[in-house]
A protein has these predicted regions:
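Active-site phosphate/pyrophosphate- and oxyanion-stabilizing loops and adjacent acidic/basic residues
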Residues: 32, 129, 191-195
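Conserved class I S-adenosyl-L-methionine
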Residues: 138-167
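Short glycine/proline- and acidic residue-enriched helix-loop micro-motifs
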Residues: 15-17, 173-183
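Conserved S-adenosyl-L-methionine
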Residues: 202-208
């Protein structure tokens, strides 16, 4: 039996497009809720974990508030390309675990799908604490739910429900070496988030 590579990659492409469309749908629904609850106009905003990509699959908040006059992007990548989306954007190259910014610098600190990539549980706790430290009032952190049926990073269903050590071994076996390492992917559940927030003595929060 021979593999028709053209048909194979066409199917892979169709599957990728399906996942992207589903992810966009759910992400848009989440931001609908966020914009109903939080006023962004006239606020000083920091986006932690921006990526150097103009596709609206990335940097969701920046795409949705293009007219905002005070938005800063902090990333360990060079994100100067994002000025094409909004010339008012200020770019800072830095580390979300230690931003070196002053306390209470921003009205809103936002981070989308970054916390699952900062590494260990300790690092994830530190990431939350740092976002809280530099925000005057509001912190928004989005991350995929570990117990959603499909992991959107690997496109593999269900195996991420398993204990993390077993999950990582299976990722190696499926040639997902990058995501098999904790420093590159450490998925969180709703209970994980609650636990981290309680560790930071945060009582006023919503998870949705």
């Amino acid at each position: 039996m021979t593999l028709d590579k053209e048909k194979y990659w066409k199917k892979v492409s169709l599957l990728e497009n399906f996942f992207r469309s589903k992810l966009k749908y759910h992400r848009d629904k989440i931001y609908e809720i966020i914009f109903k609850k939080i006023e962004f106009n006239g606020k000083k905003i920091l986006d932690v974990g921006s990526t150097p990509d103009l596709d609206d699959h990335h940097n969701t908040l920046i795409h949705k508030i293009k007219t905002n006059k005070e938005i800063t992007c902090l990333s360990n990548f060079d994100c100067s390309i994002l000025k094409k989306l909004n010339s008012n954007i200020e770019i800072i190259k830095g580390d979300g675990l230690n931003t070196k910014l002053k306390d209470n610098t921003f009205d809103i600190v936002h981070s989308s799908a970054t916390i699952e990539h900062v590494g260990s549980e300790y690092n994830q706790n530190q990431f939350i604490k740092e976002c809280l430290r530099i925000s005057k009032k509001t912190v928004i952190i989005t991350t995929p739910n570990r117990f959603f049926p499909i992991d959107f990073h690997t496109k593999i269903p269900f195996i991420h429900f398993l204990p993390k050590k077993i999950h990582r071994k299976l990722l190696v076996l499926t040639n997902n070496h990058f995501f098999s390492k904790e420093e590159n992917l450490n998925l969180l559940s709703i209970n994980d988030l609650r636990k981290y927030l309680k560790k930071s003595n945060i009582r006023d929060f919503e998870i949705f």
